[in-house]
Amino acid sequence: MELTTPTIFAIGILAFICEYVDATLGMGYGTILTPLLLLLGLAPLQVVPAVLFSQFLAGLAGGFWHHRLGNVAFDFRRDTNLSTGHPAKKLLARLGILGYLPRSRDAKVVYILGGCGIIGALAAVFLAVSIPERVQEGYIGGMLVALGFLVLATRRRKLSFSWSRLFFFGFLSAFNKGLSGGGYGPLVASGQLLSGTGSQTAVGNTTLSEAVVCLVGFLAYLATRGGVDWRLALPLAVGAVASTPLSAYTVRRLGERKLRALLAIAILALGAVTLAKVALS
């Protein structure tokens, strides 16, 4: 497909819309945008690195705006005062052997989830080859439906925050990423909600965590496949980044309860569509 000026403009608009959904709900950018670009006649070798690059930049911008508008509180300065008295804090203290742990809770969450996502992204190369695609998609779809129902069922309950549950969902998201290459965003978002994180905070944390994972995926793609079509990557990046202030503002205005319900519905819908795709294939 020839990338004319009108086409490039239309692609930028698509990226704006898809990233608005993603940075508002914590999921949907690659899931929606990649099939649309392929339907336009673009080759997968053009689309995949361009989407990863644009989502990396948009994730950074989204994290900045979510922090700026108060949806999250990121402080990535080194935490030098971590108490180890509580069992959950011991889990965090063990991460201290890495030489760095950020200060604020939201920054710690991004650190853990981003690290798990990186492990999963690298493991994807080795795990996905031996498992049938229908099995992978059926597993992811079923899990998302179950998590969506759980989030919906607990929407009126005040869940206490649990580092143990967060670690569990972090490693589960890494496993899913390694298994199928997908399911990271919705699982990380729903896992945070079920770990006692507020919905606004969960979206902001997911947005920045995905940026880290996309950067690793982009660099791995460059190392194994070669170059990037910047005529596609740049308009995608511009459109996606431009949507992030509006997304953060929307999250701020929606409030916790409405946003949690929207997240549950989005996770359920994504899981149902995935299962329907498996059933019809």
Residue ranges and their predicted role:
Residues 48-56, 203-211, 241, 267:
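Transmembrane helix-bundle signature of multi-pass membrane transporters/permeases
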Residues 117-120, 210-215:
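Core segments of transmembrane alpha-helices
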Residues 193, 197-204:
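Functional transmembrane core segments of multi-pass inner-membrane proteins
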Residues 50-68:
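Transmembrane alpha-helices of multi-pass small-molecule transport proteins
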Residues 18-21, 54, 176, 209, ...:
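Residue-level micro-sites within transmembrane alpha helices that shape
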Residues 1-24, 30-46, 63-179, 189-194, ...:
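Juxtamembrane transmembrane-helix boundary motif
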